[in-house]
Regions:
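Conserved N-terminal phosphate-binding loop of PLP-dependent enzymes in the Aspartate aminotransferase
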Residues: 1-317
């Protein structure tokens, strides 16, 4: 907003960007843009929510509203690809944002340095104006960064703003320039740069998804493990679709349905997985590390099968 002099932000329904006031509506509730509890209506009104993968809707919004400062999204799709984006979507966004003078922001808090050494933007070949980074950035310690063009980031530079006669953007923070996180992050990024950790983690993701789907097929459970890179998403099929894991295409499922997993079954599955020695994320699924060995992955697949057996024995699935 400071750079463009505009006020509004476009966001995609279902995409997560933290829980500050401008980002609470539209992730898992209030998809109509109304404010969540405690958020001022005037704040919610400055955010435009649009459905994912609808480039025409974004075009219409940008062409009819000259007060849009930025568009922010997760470049792999909501929740690290739980709701993937169609091919060419990011390139189309880049073209539209440049045409209408809107900044393009990638939220790579999860995907940065994970999808590829250069993050999702390097993998897809689309360069945003700003990118948010965290998690891997600080080597597992508290730490985050906003990166982007020198022209935009100059608003954070004391000397540049004094020279320009403009007010500097405030950005105080508890962990700003925190040396321990900086050392951990620098070390972690050096390891990533010099190794094949990305490729190994991505290959492990494919191995785990395949193994889980083999279990589901063998047990005749109409669920599917899917995803890309080093993540596995588990679709628990809330509407009881006929599913073939070998041909499952999440783009053919409404995004709301992909995110509407059975909370009861997922809770029971997570408890069963814990009982069998594996922490399973609640989205549901998980991310794979380059440190995970083949033995770890096989152990996870076996724990998954035993956990499903436990749920079946209790008539939970």
């Amino acid at each position: 907003r400071a750079h463009t002099g505009k006020n509004k932000v476009i966001r995609l329904q279902g995409h997560f960007h933290g829980w500050h006031d401008h980002m609470t509506s539209g992730f898992n509730s209030h998809h109509d843009g109304t404010p969540t509890r405690g958020v001022l209506p005037s704040v919610a009104e400055s955010v435009i929510l649009v459905p994912p993968n609808d480039i025409d809707c974004i075009h219409e919004r940008m062409s009819s509203d000259s007060d849009i400062a930025a568009l922010i999204l997760e470049p792999t799709g909501s929740t690290f690809g739980m709701v993937p984006l169609v091919d060419g979507y990011l390139s189309a966004l880049r073209e539209l944002t440049e045409r209408y003078g809107v900044l393009l922001i990638f939220d790579e808090v999860v995907t940065g340095f994970r999808v590829a050494k250069g993050g999702a933007q390097a993998h897809y070949g689309v360069m945003p104006d700003l990118t948010t980074l965290a998690k891997i950035l600080a080597g597992g310690l508290p730490g985050a960064a906003v990166v982007g063009s020198r022209e935009i980031l100059a608003a954070l530079d004391f000397d540049a703003m004094v020279a320009a006669g403009e007010e500097k953007i405030q950005h105080q923070g508890t962990f700003n320039a925190y040396p321990i996180s900086a050392v951990a992050g620098s070390t972690a990024l050096s390891i990533i740069e010099a190794s094949d950790v990305n490729e190994r983690a991505n290959a492990s993701g494919a191995f785990l998804r395949q193994g889980m789907n083999q279990v589901l097929h063998r047990m005749r459970i109409p669920w599917v493990a899917y995803g890309e890179f080093s993540v596995v998403h588990l679709f628990t099929n809330p509407d009881n679709r006929v599913i073939d894991p070998s041909s499952f295409d999440p783009l053919k499922i409404p995004w709301q349905e992909l995110k509407r997993n059975s909370s009861h079954a997922v809770t029971k599955l997570r408890l069963a997985m814990l009982a069998n020695g594996v922490e399973f994320n609640g989205f549901p699924g998980g991310t794979i590390s380059g440190a995970h060995s083949e033995a770890d992955l096989i152990f996870t697949i076996e724990a998954f099968e035993e956990s499903l057996n436990m749920l079946q024995s209790e008539n939970e699935i």
